[in-house]
Amino acid sequence: MRQLDKNQQGALQQSAFRPLQQTAFQALQHSASLKGLLKPFKGNRELAQLAEQCEVLEQGLLELAQGLLAQVRRPPFTLLPARLIEQRTSARTTFLRWQHIATRRMGVGVWAEMLRQDKTPEYLLQDLYQMELQRITLNMQISLIHSIGKQAAECAEKMGQAEAEFMGRLQQSQTRPGSVGM
């Protein structure tokens, strides 16, 4: 990545946008740990707990995204031709997307186009860049946690079905007269 010289850095000082800092993530880090992800799960309860932990983490990340959106819903960002919005997906999660106000077109291309326009004030370029980095990071974190939680919930259900089949077979063996194990 190309380094900016001192004059460019001075002209592009960040001002209106405050990116999320490590302290914003600390509560999420301490609320649930995924270090137990790589272990031999003994049953559907442990997987269901992992799915619940992921759901709590995802909600925490979405709250951080709300804080980000609150910033961009204030001037000077409300004067720009594009805005950052929430988009709910069919997979029942939410991501941050750029949307052009006039055309409703969405995507990172809208952000890039806004950055290239001479109408976009130079003093906002650093803020817009930091917003995009924050958007990318939060979307990645939300996606990962959502996927892990979804997989954990599906596996918990499959383990529950396997247990039901197993228990059904054991009960069948116990009720059958003269049944002998193999």
Predicted regions and their residues:
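Intrinsically disordered, low-complexity linkers and terminal tails enriched in Pro/Gly
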Residues: M1-Q9, S90, P177-M182
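Helical coiled-coil/dimerization "stalks"
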Residues: L80-R88, E165-M182
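Amphipathic, interaction-prone secondary-structure segments
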Residues: Q66-I101
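Coiled-coil heptad-register positions
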Residues: A65, L69-V72, P76, H146, ...
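Negatively charged, low-complexity tracts enriched in Asp/Glu with abundant Ser/Thr
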Residues: Q8, Q26-L79, Q174, G178
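Amphipathic alpha-helical coiled-coil segments
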Residues: C54-L64, L68, L124, L128-A152, ...
